[in-house]
């Protein structure tokens, strides 16, 4: 076993792996929280992006190498991905850290973790962001006991799922979105705009090029028909800098033109005045729920992903906000249901003062208490558990 007490003055060596932008942000916040607690008594190595680099991490390779989505894309890149898994595991073993912290991206990070645990069991392993064992492949939870010492969960229902599935110890540390609530809730003037005419509809067709490819046509046709039936609408489409070109190309043939805004601040500003949202399923549904914006959510994948998904997904909903609230308050339209004939009536209903809209708002009103972490930030709670695992390992 390695030296176990973070208060002894020994320098802690931590190896972090985050291969997506969201994980990079989580990793950076965790690094900052650990530096607050340990000062110069911690050294970081690993894989990360821009945010973790700002905290001092020199990444083994650019995480953009792994920013792929979809089974067909993974198959094409499989040889290079497997090489990266092997080389990353070798780098961890060569660094001999006190702990390996794997952040999200389980198809990559868990393969690294398994290799490390087999070859050097003395390295503690913490998994930050639970794989979706509650949605599909529940057997992963029990298998993780062999190579994960603790899971840091972002969603409040996940620890109970790990207990039920006999997985490793799991603690809810909080979702980083809960730290943004003050920036998501409207001022009195913004609330007045929410209630004014024409209504603002926020349009969110996805955060990856593959998602935009699958959804832009159905979004455009749906919004054209909605405006023809509903009358005037103000459409705002938030995106990120590296997707702006794809979004602008995708809306060019739409019968109605949204106002495109770029960046997180403008996205939150749009949420604060939005009457409703039309969104691709994902983390953004939880962000909209925390902003108290009723929505219609959709998901449409490629043919192969859809075929597999129908056979393995076991959760009652694919919408994060529904899972957190504990009931399906947000209507979801998946694959063959993701068509204008179904979407237009749902959007009309969520824009109007209807029981469906009221039910969503009532559910969203409970989210603050459900997701609360008290006075401590999610990154602070995560850092404290990391240190506790180090003491015990």
Swiss-Prot record:
Q: Name the chemical reaction catalysed here.
A: a lipid X + a UDP-2-N,3-O-bis[(3R)-3-hydroxyacyl]-alpha-D-glucosamine = a lipid A disaccharide + UDP + H(+)
Specify the domain of life of the species encoding this protein. Bacteria
The free-text function statement in the UniProt record for this protein reads:
Condensation of UDP-2,3-diacylglucosamine and 2,3-diacylglucosamine-1-phosphate to form lipid A disaccharide, a precursor of lipid A, a phosphorylated glycolipid that anchors the lipopolysaccharide to the outer membrane of the cell.
- Please report the name of this protein according to its UniProt entry: Lipid-A-disaccharide synthase
Q: Which Gene Ontology terms describe the biological processes this protein takes part in?
A: lipid A biosynthetic process
PANTHER family annotated for this entry? LIPID-A-DISACCHARIDE SYNTHASE, LIPID-A-DISACCHARIDE SYNTHASE, MITOCHONDRIAL-RELATED
**In which family does this protein belong, per the annotation?**
Belongs to the LpxB family.
Task: Tell me a GO cellular component.
Answer: membrane
Kindly list any coiled-coil regions of this protein: none
Q: Which InterPro entries match?
A: Glyco_trans_19
User: What EC number(s) does this enzyme carry?
Assistant: 2.4.1.182
UniProt keywords (A-Z) are: Glycosyltransferase, Lipid A biosynthesis, Lipid biosynthesis, Lipid metabolism, Transferase
Instruction: Quote one Gene Ontology molecular function term.
Output: phospholipid binding
**Pathway named in the protein's UniProt entry:** Bacterial outer membrane biogenesis; LPS lipid A biosynthesis
Q: Which organism is it from?
A: Rhodopseudomonas palustris (strain HaA2)
């Amino acid at each position: 076993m390695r030296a176990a007490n973070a208060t002894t003055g020994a320098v802690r060596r931590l190896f972090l792996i985050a291969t997506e932008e969201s994980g990079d942000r989580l990793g950076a916040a965790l690094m900052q929280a650990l530096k607050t607690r340990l000062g110069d008594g911690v050294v970081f190595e690993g894989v990360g992006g821009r945010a973790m680099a700002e905290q001092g991490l020199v990444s083994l390779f650019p995480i953009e190498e792994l920013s792929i989505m979809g089974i067909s894309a993974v198959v094409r890149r499989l040889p290079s991905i497997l090489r990266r898994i092997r080389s990353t595991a070798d780098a961890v073993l060569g660094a001999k850290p006190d702990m390996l912290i794997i952040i999200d991206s389980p198809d990559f990070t868990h393969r690294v973790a398994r290799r490390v645990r087999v070859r050097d069991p003395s390295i503690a392993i913490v998994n930050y962001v639970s794989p979706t064992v509650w949605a599909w492949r529940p057997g992963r939870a029990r298998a993780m006991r062999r190579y994960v010492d603790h899971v840091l969960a972002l969603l409040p229902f996940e620890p109970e799922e790990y207990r039920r599935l006999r997985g490793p110890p799991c603690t809810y540390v909080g979702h980083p979105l809960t730290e943004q609530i003050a920036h998501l809730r409207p001022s009195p003037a913004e609330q007045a705009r929410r209630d004014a005419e024409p209504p603002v509809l926020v349009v969110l067709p996805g955060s990856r090029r593959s998602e935009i490819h699958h959804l832009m046509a159905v979004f455009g046709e749906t919004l054209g028909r909605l405006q023809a039936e509903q009358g005037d609408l103000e459409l705002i489409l938030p995106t990120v800098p590296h997707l702006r070109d794809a979004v602008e190309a995708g809306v060019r043939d739409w019968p109605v033109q949204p106002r495109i805004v770029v960046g997180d601040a403008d996205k939150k500003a749009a949420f604060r005045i939005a009457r409703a949202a039309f969104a691709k399923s994902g983390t953004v549904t939880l962000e909209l729920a925390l902003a108290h914006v009723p929505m219609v959510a959709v998901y449409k994948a490629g043919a192969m992903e859809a075929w597999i998904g129908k056979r393995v997904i076991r959760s009652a909903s694919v919408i994060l906000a529904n899972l957190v609230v504990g009931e399906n308050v947000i209507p979801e339209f998946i694959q063959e249901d993701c068509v204008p004939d179904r979407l237009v009536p749902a959007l009309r209903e969520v824009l109007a003062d209807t029981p469906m809209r009221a039910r969503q708002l009532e559910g969203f009103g409970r989210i603050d208490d459900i997701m609360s972490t008290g006075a401590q930030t999610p990154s602070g709670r995560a850092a404290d558990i990391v240190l506790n695992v180090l003491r015990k390992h």
